[in-house]
Amino acid sequence: MISFASFFARPYFLISSLLSFFVLNQISAENANQFVDVTLESGINFRHHDGRSGQKYLLETLGSGVSFFDYDNDSYIDLYIVNGADLPGCVSPIPPTNILYRNNGDGIFTDVTAIAGVGNTQYGVGCATADYDNDGDVDLYI
């Protein structure tokens, strides 16, 4: 009868396991992907507004909704970000708006919110895109 406890206690198993661990750890450390913050270079300038009333409303704990879709049919994926709005007790000098960024195809995004007419200033937490009316164009639902 083979005992698993005696098999795992053998020195060659322990040594090979440790060596495998260190070799794999070294390989993954050398080839690890790195994330680089390119927000400023990309042209995306967004700051989420949660309403900040100080009353601890549930809305103040939620983040922004985001949708990636090709709004202008140029085969580059564009970005729409939903923003919050002022809650009772909070007044911003400039109302926060949702933003549509057009992908220029070179890693740079351009704010086309005003041109596209999608600068909603009401409180939002999500959005979805699909061809809702079956006309072949992507529709945006906020």
Where are the regions that the model predicts?
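Acidic, glycine/proline-rich Ca2+-coordinating loop motifs
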Residues: 1, 24-142
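N-terminal secretory signal peptides that target proteins for export/translocation
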Residues: 1-9
